[in-house]
Amino acid sequence: MADKGSKPRKEEVVSREYTINLHKRLHGCTFKKKAPKAIKEIRKFAQKAMGTTDVRVDVKLNKHIWSRGIRSVPRRIRVRIARKRNDDEDAKEELYSLVTVAEIPEGGLKGLGTQVIDEEE
């Protein structure tokens, strides 16, 4: 049983790296809707993984998805999702998730699992 003094798991501030398979999420999608649908799927993935409804997508990640056009979205993407505290006093949510693109190692994406990242801040 959990300790009474410990916080719930979804309340912690944490960063993790994930590999998202966009190919299976966009299969059968109309060509002209692929890139917008990919952004929506990344948001949905981050909501489920981090348990926050407020998900913010980084500009570099958006540019990476759109880099090959609206039709040719990358099959897989490595992202870093950070759950952070909301400093705004009048914010609806206490926590938000920031999704950024992670660097891909030269060995490729095979064998990489979910990794917890230590905060540099």
UniProtKB/Swiss-Prot annotation:
Biological process (GO), any one: cytoplasmic translation
Alphabetized, the UniProt keywords read: Ribonucleoprotein, Ribosomal protein
Q: Which PROSITE patterns match?
A: RIBOSOMAL_L31E
Listed under GO cellular component are: cytosolic large ribosomal subunit
State the Pfam families in the record: Ribosomal_L31e
Record carries keyword Ribosomal protein = yes
Q: What's the superkingdom here?
A: Eukaryota
Annotated GO MF terms: structural constituent of ribosome
Record's PANTHER family? 60S RIBOSOMAL PROTEIN L31 (PTHR10956:SF0)
Belongs to which family? Belongs to the eukaryotic ribosomal protein eL31 family.
| Protein name as catalogued | Large ribosomal subunit protein eL31
Q: Which organism's genome codes for this protein?
A: Perilla frutescens (Beefsteak mint)
